[in-house]
Structures are given as structure tokens and as C-alpha cells.
Amino acid sequence: MKLLIVAVGTRMPAWVEAGFGEFARRMPRELPLQLVEVKAEPRTTGKTVEAMMAAEATRIEAALPARCRRVILDEHGADLTTMALARRLEAWQAGGEDVTLIVGGPDGLSPALKATAHERLRLSSLTLPHALVRPLLAEALYRAWSVLKNHPYHRE
């Protein structure tokens, strides 16, 4: 099984790439974590928010594997604890299907793309900088894996 993060936005600050890379590198070979960036629609074109999200959704769809479990990151998604995410990761692994976590752009994800999701997760009830999602999600997935393996990284 593979974990794939498909995220809208390119040219992130170096700290984002370093943070994501650190936790992606720690993931085991049997559960690799990869990132695919898709171009955000320029906000200066005069298009409506809906049109921009639709254009980004088309790019996201093109980046998705043919078969995968789609998990949308959404402010209205399930709010999981670390232990609950670990159980979810365990269930994903048992299912054997690759899992793609989808991160929208500044305006979020189109309703049509959201409708294709198998599930929705929320990282936090706080409003966070968009760039912070990648390293935060990578760390959360690594921590969930460490819980499942009784690795000392996570402490209760």
C-alpha cells in the first residue's frame, strides 16, 4: 500500500519541503508517503471561485492513480485523534488499496470533487496556513504508523 498526498500549490517555502521530506523519509518501505503537487489556478484571471476550483479539480483528477481510496482534507471532515488516525491507517492497510489524501487550494475543493471522496478528514479546528498542511499531515501519518508499530516516537 502507498500513501499519496495530492496537494494544490507549487513552489512552497523550503521549510515546508524540509518538514514534509523529514517525515516522508521516516516512513517504512512497505508504506511509502509521496507528494504530488498540482498547479493552483491563478487568482488574477477574473474567474469565479467556482471556476478556479473546477480547474484545480481537473488537475487533481489527472494526478490521481486509477484506483485509490480518496480521502479529502476538509474543514468539515472527521476530527480524529492520533489513536483514531492510527486505527484508520490500520484499516486502510488491511484494505490493501492505495490511499490518496487530497489537499485543496486557497479556496478549498470543488463540490464535485468532494462528492467523489470515500471519506473526509480534518487536520485541525484551527485556521492554519495552507503551507503547513503538508508537513503536519506527513507527521500525523508517521505518528499513526509509529503507534501501530509500538515505536517510541509517540508517547501517551
Swiss-Prot record:
GO cellular component, one term: cytoplasm
GO molecular function, one term: rRNA (pseudouridine-N3-)-methyltransferase activity
Keywords for the protein's UniProt record, in alphabetical order: Cytoplasm, Methyltransferase, rRNA processing, S-adenosyl-L-methionine, Transferase
EC class: transferase
Entry keyword annotation includes Cytoplasm: yes
CDD domains recorded: RlmH-like (cd18081)
Residues the record lists as binding S-adenosyl-L-methionine: L73, G104, L123, S124, S125, L126, T127, L128
Subcellular location: Cytoplasm
Similarity remark: Belongs to the RNA methyltransferase RlmH family.
Protein role: Specifically methylates the pseudouridine at position 1915 (m3Psi1915) in 23S rRNA.
Oligomeric form and interacting partners: Homodimer.
Official protein name in the record: Ribosomal RNA large subunit methyltransferase H
Species of provenance: Aromatoleum aromaticum (strain DSM 19018 / LMG 30748 / EbN1) (Azoarcus sp. (strain EbN1))
GN (gene name): rlmH
